[in-house]
Amino acid sequence: MASQLTDAFARKFYYLRLSITDVCNFRCTYCLPDGYKPGGVTNNGFLTVDEIRRVTRAFASLGTEKVRLTGGEPSLRRDFTDIIAAVGENDAIRQIAVTTNGYRLARDAANWREAGLTGVNVSVDSLDARQFHAITGQDKFRQVMAGIDAAFDAGFEKVKVNTVLMRDVNHYQLDTFLAWIQPRPIQLRFIELMETGEGSDLFRKHHISGQVLRDELIKRGWIHQLRQRSDGPAQVFCHPDYAGEIGLIMPYEKDFCATCNRLRVSSVGKLHLCLFGDGGVSLRDLLQDDAQQYALEERISDALREKKQTHFLHQSNTGITQNLSYIGG
């Protein structure tokens, strides 16, 4: 087994975000406002179960303990349950999570849990059904809420909910969100709107700093918790009267990248060192045979030497990320 993946800035990487498709059936305003438009990749062009098995085996050998399956919408893959099971074949991987729009959660949460899934993140940008429809292009609010309930019923002890923070859209709804998580063990994560290549106008119109919410939380008696390794870049707040927690993810905050612990592999097998980095390193030619594992590990380790200390979002440099479905956010 190789040593733990570590970059030139002594950051250790134990978390892999693995995109398995860039197809999505929602049309979120900040991601795919015009809906999914196939590029050069057909469904047959995405990583196969065997390729996923090989890439996660290599990362597990390099110290990866957590894999998050992303998209697009991962559950649109008909073999999604098989993918969960394939990742779970690696004993070193202790956590297998998914980020989903919740579209199929009510139907499939129990099956995913049985296959080995340990964590669920659901995207919910508004608790108002009409506004949810306006943001996502889908009238599925009640279906997604039922999915969150189904996740708890299936045995997931905590569900994370991702909410993209947008000025004049949902930034003023903090009290509504807090009331929702008071009786529920949900970690509600407000994510600052990030600029992407296709979303510059939206960013200028709707970006608001997460510091605004942080100040409001502190006023209301919420306590900033000591950072746990599993938090990654999130600042987590708790309150003695609430079963839920609040997380703030603020990529424009000073030193945001200092706690980076994750690498990304796209749905076509490219290693990306940063969500907003350039290029990417193709791994796919080394995912065709089990005998290639050593060479695959070497390529991953060598690529990490090029990881930059920080992103360049402050200079409006969004790198290769034209939209957030591209490499899974």
UniProtKB/Swiss-Prot annotation:
Residues passing through the membrane, by range: none
Pfam families per record: Mob_synth_C (PF06463), Radical_SAM (PF04055)
UniProt binding sites for [4Fe-4S] cluster 2: 257, 260, 274
UniProt GO molecular function: 4 iron, 4 sulfur cluster binding; cyclic pyranopterin monophosphate synthase activity; GTP 3',8'-cyclase activity; GTP binding; metal ion binding; S-adenosyl-L-methionine binding
Keywords of the record: 4Fe-4S, GTP-binding, Iron, Iron-sulfur, Lyase, Metal-binding, Molybdenum cofactor biosynthesis, Nucleotide-binding, S-adenosyl-L-methionine
Catalytic reactions of this protein: GTP + AH2 + S-adenosyl-L-methionine = (8S)-3',8-cyclo-7,8-dihydroguanosine 5'-triphosphate + 5'-deoxyadenosine + L-methionine + A + H(+)
Residue ranges of domain Radical SAM core in the record: 8-234
Enzyme class: lyase
Ligand binding (GTP): 17, 68, 99, 160, 262-264
The keyword GTP-binding belongs to this UniProt entry's keyword annotation: yes
UniProt-listed Enzyme Commission number(s): 4.1.99.22
Binding site for [4Fe-4S] cluster 1: 24, 28, 31
Note on cofactor: Binds 2 [4Fe-4S] clusters. Binds 1 [4Fe-4S] cluster coordinated with 3 cysteines and an exchangeable S-adenosyl-L-methionine and 1 [4Fe-4S] cluster coordinated with 3 cysteines and the GTP-derived substrate.
Pathway stated in the Swiss-Prot or TrEMBL entry: Cofactor biosynthesis; molybdopterin biosynthesis
Cofactor: [4Fe-4S] cluster
Residues given in the record as S-adenosyl-L-methionine binding sites: 30, 72, 123, 194
GO terms for biological process, alphabetical: Mo-molybdopterin cofactor biosynthetic process
Record's subunit section: Monomer and homodimer.
Family in the record: Belongs to the radical SAM superfamily. MoaA family.
Function according to Swiss-Prot or TrEMBL: Catalyzes the cyclization of GTP to (8S)-3',8-cyclo-7,8-dihydroguanosine 5'-triphosphate.
Name of the protein: GTP 3',8-cyclase
Species for this entry: Salmonella paratyphi C (strain RKS4594)
Gene (name only): moaA
